[in-house]
From Swiss-Prot:
EC number: 3.5.2.7
Keyword Ligase: no
GO molecular function: imidazolonepropionase activity; iron ion binding; zinc ion binding
Pfam short name (any one): Amidohydro_1
Entry protein name: Imidazolonepropionase
BP GO terms, sorted: L-histidine catabolic process to glutamate and formamide; L-histidine catabolic process to glutamate and formate
Lineage per the UniProt record: Bacteria, Pseudomonadati, Pseudomonadota, Gammaproteobacteria, Enterobacterales
Family under the similarity heading: Belongs to the metallo-dependent hydrolases superfamily. HutI family.
Binding site for 4-imidazolone-5-propanoate: 81, 144, 177, 245, 322
Gene: hutI
Signal sequence segment: none
GO cellular component terms attached to this protein's record: cytoplasm
Binding site for Zn(2+): 72, 74, 242, 317
UniProt-annotated binding residues for Fe(3+): 72, 74, 242, 317
Reactions this protein catalyses: 4-imidazolone-5-propanoate + H2O = N-formimidoyl-L-glutamate
Length: 405
């Protein structure tokens, strides 16, 4: 990523969709305004007529939004699950597929068998699809290595991928994603490995900034999840959780008790869980791609989230098994069509609320003075166009820390 310049640059003659809730206009729209950028941050937002002299870039009336943030991805993995998907369409159960060596274990096996260079090459085109949609920050999880060596490998690849492509990274340790084959029948033993070895070692190496757990009947129990959260808390590491996707186990309350950044999926979230999230400031991360791909029918309780004013993020959940969609615009569209969000809520979900889900709400996700100068420039009249027509992606430019990529 190029270094931010100390010279002030004026991005002028723009229509700004600031996504700043302090403005009364929908999307925080400001007509004919300019962004003053210095040292990788937005110095000020002024009316174009009031912009000072100096180095300037004329945007010719183009739309500018905050850079998009994908706050939940599993971008690094080996292998493919396409044939498995075809089997499921033909009526073969996941249990049968898994018993025959498929399912998440096939991804674990392929990821373990891949070198860092191979994983980097596989991830590059996936990331490229997100960048073409204006993404400037994304979260990438581990969770297909499931041992110290391979979890380290995944996180190293995530860092290299971000460094090579002009995008900001939020890396998450998801070692508690599934029980690896060598611990079959001993999930508690594997959680001990996570808590005592994988988590502290990779934290000391500086490879991640938050910890996630798949808390579900087919994943880890609330008790096992809490062991991981306690280990993270002891080191001062923020937590988040895959919770209430397939059943209601009280995972949202558990995440909230540890002041988690986000509770993700949450199709089976109860009102008690929503209230707990409101109290703790935990973001609801909606993942409509997985809902669609699995042909689920139970939807997240969007009306309750609105009632309790819980921020709703929207993410791709890009992964090989349940959401093979590297398109944040498609996720926004699905969130509107399937979950009932408004387009403006969907935009907030991939900007300021996604930033909050990563603990970056004070620096990312809005066009505002003092915020990091991450923004996307569009050949479009209005933000709704990207939600309405996923796949078009009329991106003119992507700016990260003040530098066009």
């Amino acid at each position: 990523m190029t270094q931010a310049t100390s010279e002030r640059v004026i991005w002028r003659n723009a229509r700004l969709a600031t996504l700043n809730p302090d403005y009364s206009q929908p999307y925080g729209l400001l007509e004919r305004h300019a962004l003053l950028v210095r040292n990788g941050r937005i110095e000020a937002i002024v009316a174009d007529a009031d912009a000072p002299g100096g180095r300037s870039i004329d945007l010719e009336g183009r739309l500018v939004t905050p850079g998009l943030i994908d706050c939940h991805t599993h971008l690094i993995f080996g292998g493919s699950r396409a044939q498995e998907w075809e089997q499921r369409l033909n009526g073969v159960s996941y249990q049968t597929i898994s018993a025959n060596g498929g399912g998440i274990n096939s991804t674990v096996r392929a990821t373990r068998d891949s070198s860092e260079a191979e994983l980097l090459a596989l991830a590059q085109p996936r990331l490229a699809r997100l960048l073409r949609e204006g993404v400037t920050t994304l979260e990438i999880k581990s969770g297909y290595g499931l041992d110290l060596q391979n979890e380290r490998k995944m996180l190293r690849v995530a860092r290299q991928l971000a460094d090579d492509n002009g995008v900001e990274l939020s890396a998450t340790l998801l070692s508690a994603h599934a029980t690896p084959p060598e611990y079959h029948g001993d999930a508690d033993g594997y959680i001990s490995l996570v808590c005592e070895t994988i988590l502290p070692t990779l934290w000391q190496e500086g490879l991640f900034e938050s910890v996630d757990v798949f808390c579900e009947n087919v994943g880890f129990s609330p008790q096992q999840t809490e062991r991981v959260f306690q280990a993270a808390q002891a080191l001062g590491i923020p937590v988040k959780g895959h919770v209430e996707q397939l059943s209601s186990l009280g995972g949202a309350q558990l995440v909230s008790r540890y002041h988690g950044l986000s509770a993700d999926h949450i199709e089976y979230l109860t009102e008690e869980g929503v209230a707990a999230m409101r109290e703790s400031g935990t973001v609801a991360a909606l993942l409509p791609g997985a809902f669609y791909f699995l042909n689920e029918t139970r939807k997240p309780p969007v009306e309750l989230l609105r009632k309790y004013q819980v921020p709703m993020a929207v993410a791709t959940d890009f992964n090989p098994g349940t959401s093979p969609f590297a398109s944040l615009h498609l996720a926004m569209n699905m969130a509107c069509v399937k979950f009932g969000l408004t387009p403006e809520e969907a935009w907030a979900g991939v900007t300021r609320h996604a930033a909050r889900a990563l603990g970056r709400q004070d620096s990312h996700g809005q066009l505002a003075a003092g915020f990091v100068a991450n923004f996307a420039i569009w050949d479009a009249e209005h933000p709704v166009e990207m939600v309405y027509e996923p796949g078009r992606a009329p991106l003119w430019g992507r700016v990260v820390r003040g530098e066009r990529q």
